[in-house]
Design a protein with these regions (language model features):
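A Lys-centered signature of the CheY-like receiver
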Residues: 113
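Helix N-cap/capping motif at the beta->alpha junctions
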Residues: 39-48, 69-71
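Receiver (REC) domain active-site loop signature in two-component systems and cognate sites
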Residues: 64
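Active-site residues of response regulator receiver
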Residues: 61
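Non-catalytic signal-transmission and effector/linker regions of two-component phosphorelay proteins
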Residues: 1-12, 116-130
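Conserved phosphotransfer cores of two-component systems
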Residues: 51-53, 76-85
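Two-component/phosphorelay signaling modules centered on CheY-like receiver
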Residues: 20-38, 108
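Hydrophobic/aromatic residues positioned on beta-strands within the core alpha/beta folds
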Residues: 90-91
Length: 130
């Protein structure tokens, strides 16, 4: 779990993915665009951050150890329901039957990996509203 800070006035994005190299890359890119970015390798770590920190948006994988992305989404809904509209799912498993129904039911952006950082940045701006 990494909570590096950017500028004090920046929006805080939580990156949830068990691919550590990917989250660290996204973290550096987001910080270069004046976002604060925290990382979590599991849904359990991410839930702890959501419960203890202000988060403006969540970029989340689906297939992760301990707590899958869809279950993390529902857990966040219990503790911070206002964040449900601020999820962006980024996954290599969008067509997996385990997740397909879930992804159709949520009204949030979903991107298949690999996705360009520019598309993520556009989506983040739309989700956060800046």
């Amino acid at each position: 779990m990494d909570t590096r800070n950017g500028p004090a006035s920046s929006k805080h994005v939580l990156l949830v993915d068990d691919d550590i190299d990917l989250t660290l890359t996204w973290q550096e890119l987001l910080q270069a665009h004046d976002y604060r970015a925290s990382t979590a390798a599991t849904g359990v770590q991410a839930l702890r951050l959501v419960m203890n920190c202000h988060v403006d948006a969540i970029l989340c994988d689906l297939s992760m150890p301990e707590l899958a992305g869809n279950l993390f989404y529902f857990a966040v809904g219990r503790v911070r329901p206002q964040l449900l509209k601020r999820f962006i799912f980024v996954t290599a498993n969008a067509d997996n039957p385990l997740y397909e129904t879930f992804l159709k039911s949520v009204k949030v952006p979903v991107f298949a990996k690999p996705v360009s950082f520019e598309r993520l940045l556009e989506s983040l701006k739309a989700v956060i509203g800046n």
